[in-house]
A protein has these predicted regions:
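Glycine-rich loops and low-complexity Gly/Arg-rich segments
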Residues: 31-35, 56-61, 94-98
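Short, flexible, solvent-exposed loop/turn segments with mixed acidic/basic and small polar residues
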Residues: 1-2, 57-63, 88-90
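Short, structured motif recognition centered on aromatic/hydrophobic residues
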Residues: 6-10, 65-72, 83
Length: 120
């Protein structure tokens, strides 16, 4: 997967909670990348910086969601457990939609992952 652990974030407000999340990830040497709406059609593997993935240059109309979502890329099980525990320990509202980047979903775009997570 990714060489350096990375968390993709969607629809986070520029507030104190987001600042605390960024600070925690930085302390743990995990990168944080906010994904913007125009990038929602890009393959998750591309957004995570995986080799072999290219930017989707085709035109897409529509497609958006407004809920927060996290995609953890290249985190060890221990890193992901500690990250999720951080929300509880700090009393932060949890993120309902979260996933690990996998060999299957790395080919999906953010909208497809969102739809799959909403179904679960």
């Amino acid at each position: 997967m990714t060489e350096k652990p990375l968390v993709l974030g969607y629809n986070f407000k520029p507030d104190e909670r987001t600042r605390l999340i960024r600070r925690y990830l930085n302390k743990e040497k995990i990168s944080f990348r906010m994904v913007e709406v125009p990038e929602f059609w890009q393959p998750l593997g591309y957004l995570a910086g995986l080799s072999g993935f290219q930017k989707d240059t085709s035109f897409h109309l529509g497609g958006n969601f407004f809920e927060e979502m996290l995609v953890m890329c290249g985190l060890s099980p221990d890193q992901s457990d500690r990250f999720l525990r951080f929300f509880r320990e700090e009393g932060l509202d949890p993120v309902a939609l979260k996933a690990m980047l996998t060999p299957v979903n790395q080919h999906w775009n953010s909208l497809k992952l969102y739809e799959e997570l909403k179904r679960e």
